[in-house]
Amino acid sequence: MRDFGEAPPPETFFERLKSGLSRSTAGLSDSLTGIFTKRKLDAETIAEFEEALIRADLGASFATRLAGEVANGRHDAEISTYEVRNILAAEIAKMLKGVEKPLAIDSSKKPFVILVAGVNGTGKTTTIGKIAKRLTDQGHKVLLAAGDTFRAAAIEQLQVWGQRTKSDVVSRPAGSDAAGLAFDAVEQARKTGADVVLIDTAGRLQNKAGLMSELEKIVRVIKKLDATAPHATLLVLDATTGQNALSQVEAFKATVPLTGLVMTKLDGTAKGGILVALADKFGLPVHFIGVGEAASDLQPFDAQAFANALTGKS
């Protein structure tokens, strides 16, 4: 029995994930209960189920396959919401397992250069800080490059993370050339023996052509120092944007060689299912997911835990 004077035990990440995805889960659970309670599995039921999955942002292609899986061999039979939830969790986990991939730092590439892209508002700069915290905790020497030179707040934010993680920060006044800054950062990392360079970039959606050409320029300039760099290019996505995340991946993928995704703001959104649609359409590794403001709220992606949390399976 716990003493009332004691602090409650801290929530596990799964508990935080489950709590964060509660709005996504509630919408899906309500739909399943409404569709499968005291009804036999016929064409109409399956069509409603498929529509519910699409409304939950799981994507049309995956929804069709999943509806087929539930219908398989069960025509005119009754199936409980519990059974459907278990099938749903198993199929989502199976599909997401293919994109569950930790961010690996290749120590033979020093510095290991990570370019981080994403539109304004996704939490990109904060995500860079959290990744820096994780890497420094693992013993890596990290250098941060404040490449979002269009936002003074982003530069200041990265400087704060530099202090928190005891990492060097390369920054220039707002409006400076981002590609030149990235070049200087990689050069400085070589001189100081940094293991990893994390490069922030601008995310101005209102000037997409300029944004994309700037990203291309950063990649070109970095390659002058190391033809194999950047060694990882991550796209940070905001879960609350739902289907819009698909077009963001398309746009960035056409410009830079994306190697992985980070999904933020899964807490408090009803659109958590979009991660399933992204994985199904693009198959890009998902390195991290975020469910809150604290550094510990960004964790490596766990397909089974995510599938269980999304479907409300304990």
Annotate each language-model stretch with its function.
Residues 93-314:
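P-loop/Walker A NTP-binding module and the surrounding RecA-like catalytic core of P-loop NTPases
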